[in-house]
């Protein structure tokens, strides 16, 4: 069922590149239809949003009432509430350690330079909800924003026939989110990016979503901020060895595959027998999975089991894939981990299962996908800050440094720049 590759094959690199590119192309194919939706929402506002909500989500409600929200929350099991509370506390604790220090510096000329972190004023959090509900995504996006000091938090989350998941609503209440909209997809992204009569636009949009949502965020970027990476369909790469438990490894792969039909699950091992055992376990475990159809499609289309006898080749391949999630489920992971440069998050050892990081370990699960871990990072408190430089020059400072600036400005042909300095240091 799952594609099995041997790195010793002379066409291995080409085959792997083709498989990875094929999935990337699927993720990127949605841009044309997304642009049409965004233009429609910009032109027709709430009317366009309702049109797409009725078509895709069978929903005719843009914003649930406070009464509807409270009624839904009251129906939530206490165990789930406590689990959300625990996750909130742990995520808050870890992210509160990510505080950033303002810088203030005065030089010998009494010029004062400052660099300050200023919270973004308004942020919209996109929480997926078309095939499953994710209260954890509310926490992962909202808690760092709370730590940063964002004043206005907005949540967009596609409801099912206008009804949102009680756990998602409880998590939003826990995070003191007062603006909640039961909309999703590209139209929701356009709504918070450009605003409508019912929805006030925001300064930044963050949060994971399917390929359509990811494409929409890329399209609105520039008119509104987005996170420093695109959080698209989920990915995991697992490196295991003969000491790994094949039952555990299979369940980790399936756990990622059940997210989305475009989820990417890759296994790499130096041991052929573990690959066979994991493959067998996957077939058996899928029979017990409620979301087996999604997981099976994902594994069939984007799953890869790779035999790779060289440690260096494994390291190079992982850095090339640059996965969202990486599990180093090997005995020698300490020797390997320092050489891994491209991954959204790295789970070390047999107990650090990716599913734990999705919920209450404390680290963030909104991570770069589609190989963007080569140049970007997951959501952190830093995502919700702007950095502003403050400059206060003394008379002595401009008189001392100004002549050099005039020289450079004239050299670059920017005479106006040079003259604006000259006028301040000209002797009368």
From Swiss-Prot:
User: Alphabetically, which GO biological process terms does the record hold?
Assistant: L-histidine biosynthetic process
Provide one Gene Ontology cellular component.
Answer: cytosol
List where the protein spans the membrane. Answer: none
Report the GO molecular function annotations.
Answer: histidinol dehydrogenase activity; NAD binding; zinc ion binding
Q: Per the database entry, which stretches of residues form a coiled coil?
A: none
Pfam family name, one: Histidinol_dh
* Catalytic reaction equation(s): L-histidinol + 2 NAD(+) + H2O = L-histidine + 2 NADH + 3 H(+)
* Entry EC no(s): 1.1.1.23
Q: What is the free-text note on the cofactor?
A: Binds 1 zinc ion per subunit.
Q: Which residues bind Zn(2+)?
A: 256, 259, 358, 417
Q: Where is the active site?
A: 324-325
Q: Which UniProt keywords apply?
A: Amino-acid biosynthesis, Histidine biosynthesis, Metal-binding, NAD, Oxidoreductase, Zinc
InterPro entries, per this entry?
Ald_DH/histidinol_DH, Histidinol_DH_CS, Histidinol_DH_monofunct, Hstdl_DH
Which residues take part in binding substrate? 234, 256, 259, 325, 358, 412, 417
The superkingdom listed in its UniProt entry is Bacteria
List, alphabetically, the NCBIfam families matched: hisD
Q: What does this protein do?
A: Catalyzes the sequential NAD-dependent oxidations of L-histidinol to L-histidinaldehyde and then to L-histidine.
> What is the name attached to this protein's record?
Histidinol dehydrogenase
Q: What is the lineage of its organism?
A: Bacteria, Pseudomonadati, Pseudomonadota, Alphaproteobacteria, Candidatus Pelagibacterales
């Amino acid at each position: 069922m799952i594609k099995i590759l041997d790195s010793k094959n002379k066409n291995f690199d080409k085959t792997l590149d083709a498989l990875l590119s094929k999935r990337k192309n699927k993720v990127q194919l949605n841009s044309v239809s997304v642009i049409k939706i965004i233009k429609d929402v910009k032109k027709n506002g709430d009317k366009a949003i309702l049109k797409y909500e009725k078509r895709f989500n069978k929903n005719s409600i843009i914003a649930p009432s406070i009464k509807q929200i409270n009624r839904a929350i009251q129906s939530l099991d206490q165990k789930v509430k406590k689990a959300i509370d625990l996750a909130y506390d742990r995520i808050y604790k870890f992210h509160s350690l990510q505080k950033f220090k303002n810088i203030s510096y005065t030089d010998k000329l009494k010029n004062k330079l400052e660099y300050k972190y200023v919270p973004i004023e308004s942020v919209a959090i996109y929480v997926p909800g078309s095939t499953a509900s994710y209260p954890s995504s509310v926490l992962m996006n909202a808690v760092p924003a709370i730590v940063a000091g964002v004043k206005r938090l907005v949540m967009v989350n596609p409801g099912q026939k206008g009804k949102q998941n009680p756990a998602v609503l409880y998590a939003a209440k826990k995070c003191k989110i007062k603006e909640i909209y039961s909309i999703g997809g590209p139209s929701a992204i356009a709504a918070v990016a450009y605003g409508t009569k019912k929805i006030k636009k925001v300064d930044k949009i963050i949060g994971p979503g399917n390929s359509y949502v990811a494409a929409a965020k890329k399209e609105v970027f520039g008119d509104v901020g987005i996170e420093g990476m695109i959080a698209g369909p989920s990915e995991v790469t697992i490196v295991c060895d003969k000491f790994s438990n094949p039952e555990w490894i299979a369940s980790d792969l399936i756990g990622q595959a059940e997210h989305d039909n475009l989820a990417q699950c890759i296994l790499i091992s130096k041991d052929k027998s573990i690959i066979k055992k994991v493959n067998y376990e996957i077939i058996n475990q899928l029979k017990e999975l409620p979301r087996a159809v999604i997981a099976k499609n994902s594994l069939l289309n984007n799953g890869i089991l790779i035999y790779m006898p060289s440690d260096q080749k494994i390291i190079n391949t992982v850095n090339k894939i640059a996965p969202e999630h990486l599990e180093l489920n090997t005995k020698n992971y300490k020797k390997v981990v320092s050489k891994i440069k491209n991954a959204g998050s790295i789970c070390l050892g047999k107990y650090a299962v990716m599913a734990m990081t999705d919920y209450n370990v404390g680290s963030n699960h909104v991570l770069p996908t589609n190989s963007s871990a080569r140049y970007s990072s997951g959501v952190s408190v830093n995502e919700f800050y702007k950095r502003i430089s403050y400059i206060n020059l003394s008379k002595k400072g401009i008189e001392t440094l100004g002549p050099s600036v005039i020289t450079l400005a004239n050299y670059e042909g920017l005479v106006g720049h040079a003259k604006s300095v000259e006028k301040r240091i000209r002797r009368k």
